[in-house]
Each structure stands twice: as C-alpha cells, then as structure tokens.
C-alpha cells in the first residue's frame, strides 16, 4: 500500500486564519489516520504579499495547535527544499523545457495591453481571458523581441478542446472544459514561477498523494491538471475541496471582518485552549460516525476519513467554540487550570490580590474563554453592595428572612475556621432549619454578597469577601426590616 503524504502549503502573508488552520488540520488527520506523513511547505513566490515574520507566525501557531509536521523547513526530510524561493532555478528550467517542446510560449504582451483586454471583456459582460496574441508568434518575431530585451512571461498552451476532470474526494466528479481556461502564466517576467506552476512541481517532487484544500482552488485544479499533463507527470495527487466557511449571515467568512475573531493568534490571546480550537475546526465540514462533539487529537486521528467530509458551507459559530472551550476548561485539573488562567488574570481589588488561585478556581465552571475571567470577577466583586442598592423587586425576596439571617450570622460568627466547607455546611443547616430550599435562601444571599441573582459558588464568594465583611453585610440586612 502506498504511503499517504499530505501537505499544508501556506504563503507567509500574515497570521494563520481559521480557514488555513482547518486545511492544515484535515491534511494532518488524513495522513496520521493512515500512518502517513504530513508536510509543511512554504509557498513564498508572491514576494509582493509576503510579510516579515509570516513564516514563523504560521508555523508557531500550528505548533500551538499541536499540528506538528513530519517534514518542514525546521525538520527537513529527503524531499526539500521546503520553501519555494529556494527552488526557483528548478521551476525556470522546467518552464523553458516546455517552451522547447512547444507546450509553452513566451508572451511579450505588456501589462497595459492585458489590462485593456480585460476591461473590454468586462464591458461586454465576458469572463476576462488572454486572447492568445503571442501564442503563434513567428520565430523571427520572437528573436527580435529577445534581441531587444523585451520583457516576457511564459504561458502554457491550454488545449481548448480538452476536458480536465477529476474525482474530487469531497465533491465527486468535476469536469472543467478547456475552452473555459486561459493560457496560464507559468513564469513571470521577473523569472519567478507562478503559484500554479510551482505547486505542481513541488507536489510531484515531494510525492504528495492527497491534497485537501479550500473550494476556491477548484478552478486552479484544472490548470494544475493541464500543467501535470504538459510536464508528463504520471503520478497526480488525489484532490478534495473543502466547504466554504461562512458567517451567521451565510456569507463567506472575510478576513476584513474585524468584529469576528478568526485568526489563531487571536484565540491564543483571548484564552482558548488549543485542544478546543482543533476540536471545533475539525467539525467545520467533517461529520464523525459517532454522535458526539468532543474529540481529543488522537480520537480525531482514529475517526477521520475523507468520505465523512462534506462540501456544504460550514457555519463558523463562535458560541459553539466557546461551549467546546468551556468543556475543555472544566476538564483541566485545578493546577493545570490555574497555570492556564493565570496568564489572563488581572485582579485590581486589593483584598483579592493575594488570593489569585482561590479567585480563579471560583470561576472554573463558568468560563467560556480565559480573558473572560476578569469580567466575571468584576461582575461578582465590584457591584455596590447593601440594602440601598437593591431593586424593589429584589427587596421582596427578603420578607420574613430576618430570623434566618440572624441565625446564619450567629453561626458564621461562631465558626472556628473561615473555610468554604464550613461556610457551605452552615448554609445547608440554615436552609434545613428554616425550611428554605434552593432559591428561597440562596438567591437572597447572592443579592447580599454580589447584588446578582446568579453566579459562581456562593460559599466561595463569601470566603473571599472575608468573615468581617460578610457579617457586616448580614447585619445591615437584618436591621433593615423597615425596607422589606
């Protein structure tokens, strides 16, 4: 059986987007499911769009997700180089070989001429397409241009009568007629290979067997099949084109939408766990055989098959990601949780500063993402407390509670140790003694200590407030009988 080799081939043009991350995850899972190899190749031939630090950012964010390549620029194998800018001579040599065989040709058309033709096509409501001006130039004309050092690109001669078809692993049979394609540029005027030309050569040289990528590459696949054919390559990867990721309005997720966090770096900064992000992204366009939502990376590897990948649009639901992340946060041990959350914790209440771990643990079961803890702390400990700050509706809850509050105050005063267990036990005793079940006791107490109806563990809140403040607040409510 052939060894499965997949690849993720980002361009260093910025941060790792969820679309690229999902592509990397799917290719990683496919390779590992079959005990194959996953390669990361850097496609940096579009020099105008490359940004400084782009390569490091892409690879670091993939490492954070746990998507570790078997081969890359940092751990090369036998199929390098793993960055296209180090392979320019190979692309150039092969492009000129195609010219020599009559399968490609030099195009001397200027940018201005090509832009004029493009605008004319658009004005006539036609798809812009190269008109083939230089396709059949006489050899003397070509030589004259070369002697005069006229800049040129190299274009592939597309067979307009051919059909380019493949059995897409996600979408089934796809056929694109040759007459819908243009004579694609293989080599730019600066001698640098274009994306479509370089990717075909790299996939061949690296023995890539399977390529899963975004739906926007469907049209590129037809060109790549034509290039494979021209180069005489017999081994062509199996292609699969993934679903489009859409926002809540059904539109394709746009990197320009700054209101939606959609870059892996942002998830790190907001306090999402890498396991949760991988779990969430794996479910964008893939359905498991199991009726479940939570998968470890090893469970994903075991379960992932291409026949469960769907082509229908995948909804990017940030609420679902938060729900998944909350699950993973709850699963952490207390020590692991504190080590995680301490990176996001900014406590500015003096009486809480020496209780970072206790405060953090109080909100463990409420958190959707790390940075949210500061808002939860603020909502719980910052509200103005006391009878005068209660709404009229809430004051109604305290009718006939004075005796219970007085007894609670006395029992709390008598506690030898101010611990959560002791406070919780006292609350239970008061509830039983006065037949105050559930909300009849706990909601009024929450209002006393947080001015909120809901929140984290009540005993934990009381312990963090401290015995003195708890007793003082209870006495204020006990003596405010005229307000209830």
UniProtKB/Swiss-Prot annotation:
PROSITE patterns to which the protein is assigned, alphabetical: AA_TRNA_LIGASE_I (PS00178)
Disulfide bonds: none
Domain of life the protein comes from: Bacteria
A single GO cellular-component term on record: cytosol
InterPro entries the record matches: aa-tRNA-synth_I_cd-bd, aa-tRNA-synth_I_codon-bd_sub2, aa-tRNA-synth_I_CS, aa_tRNA-synth_I_cd-bd_sf, Glu-tRNA-ligase_bac/mito, Glu/Gln-tRNA-synth, Glu/Gln-tRNA-synth_Ib_cat-dom, GluQ/Sye
EC class name: ligase
Localization per record: Cytoplasm
Record function comment: Catalyzes the attachment of glutamate to tRNA(Glu) in a two-step reaction: glutamate is first activated by ATP to form Glu-AMP and then transferred to the acceptor end of tRNA(Glu).
Family listed: Belongs to the class-I aminoacyl-tRNA synthetase family. Glutamate--tRNA ligase type 1 subfamily.
Name of the protein this chain belongs to: Glutamate--tRNA ligase
Organism of this sequence: Mycoplasma pneumoniae (strain ATCC 29342 / M129 / Subtype 1) (Mycoplasmoides pneumoniae)
């Amino acid at each position: 059986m052939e060894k499965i080799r997949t690849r993720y081939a980002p361009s260093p043009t910025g941060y790792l987007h969820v679309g690229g991350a999902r592509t990397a995850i799917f290719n990683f899972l496919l390779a590992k499911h079959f005990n194959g190899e996953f390669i990361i190749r850097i496609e940096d031939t579009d020099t105008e769009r490359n940004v400084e630090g782009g390569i490091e950012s892409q690879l670091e964010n993939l490492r954070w997700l746990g998507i570790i390549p078997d081969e890359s620029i940092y751990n090369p194998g036998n199929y390098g180089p793993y960055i296209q800018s180090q392979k320019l001579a190979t692309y150039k040599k092969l492009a000129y070989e195609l010219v020599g065989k009559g399968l490609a040709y030099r195009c001397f058309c200027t940018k201005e001429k090509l832009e004029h033709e493009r605008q004319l096509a658009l004005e006539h409501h036609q798809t812009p397409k190269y008109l083939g001006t230089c396709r059949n130039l006489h050899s003397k004309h070509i030589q004259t241009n070369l002697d005069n050092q006229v800049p040129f690109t190299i274009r592939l001669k597309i067979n307009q009568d051919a059909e380019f078809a493949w059995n897409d692993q996600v979408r089934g049979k796809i056929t694109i007629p040759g007459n819908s394609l243009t004579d694609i540029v293989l080599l730019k005027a600066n001698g640098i290979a274009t994306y479509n030309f370089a990717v075909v050569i790299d996939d061949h040289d690296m023995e890539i067997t399977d390529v899963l990528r975004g739906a926007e590459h469907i049209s590129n696949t037809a060109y790549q099949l034509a290039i494979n054919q021209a180069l005489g390559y017999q081994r062509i990867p199996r292609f699969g084109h993934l679903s489009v990721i859409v926002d809540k309005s059904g539109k394709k997720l746009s990197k320009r939408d700054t209101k939606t966090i959609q870059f892996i770096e942002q998830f790190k900064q907001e306090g999402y766990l890498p396991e949760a992000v991988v779990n969430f992204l794996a479910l964008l366009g893939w359905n498991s055989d199991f009726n479940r939502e939570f998968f470890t990376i090893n469970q994903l590897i075991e379960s992932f098959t291409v026949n469960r990948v769907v082509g229908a649009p995948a909804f990017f639901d940030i609420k679902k990601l938060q729900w998944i992340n909350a699950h993973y946060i709850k699963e952490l041990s207390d020590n692991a949780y504190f080590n995680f959350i301490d990176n996001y914790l900014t406590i500015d209440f003096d009486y809480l500063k020496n209780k970072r771990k206790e405060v953090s643990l109080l909100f463990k079961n409420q958190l959707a993402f790390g940075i949210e803890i500061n808002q939860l702390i603020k909502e719980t400990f910052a509200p103005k407390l006391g009878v005068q700050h209660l709404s009229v509706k809430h004051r109604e809850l305290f009718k006939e509670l004075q005796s219970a509050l007085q007894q609670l105050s006395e029992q709390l005063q008598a506690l030898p140790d101010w611990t959560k267990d002791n406070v919780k036990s006292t609350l239970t005793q008061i509830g039983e003694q006065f037949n105050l079940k559930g909300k009849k006791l706990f909601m009024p107490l929450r209002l006393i200590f947080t001015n909120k109806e809901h929140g984290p563990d009540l005993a934990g809140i009381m312990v963090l407030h401290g015995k003195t403040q708890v007793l003082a607040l209870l006495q204020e409510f006990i003596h405010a009988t005229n307000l209830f």
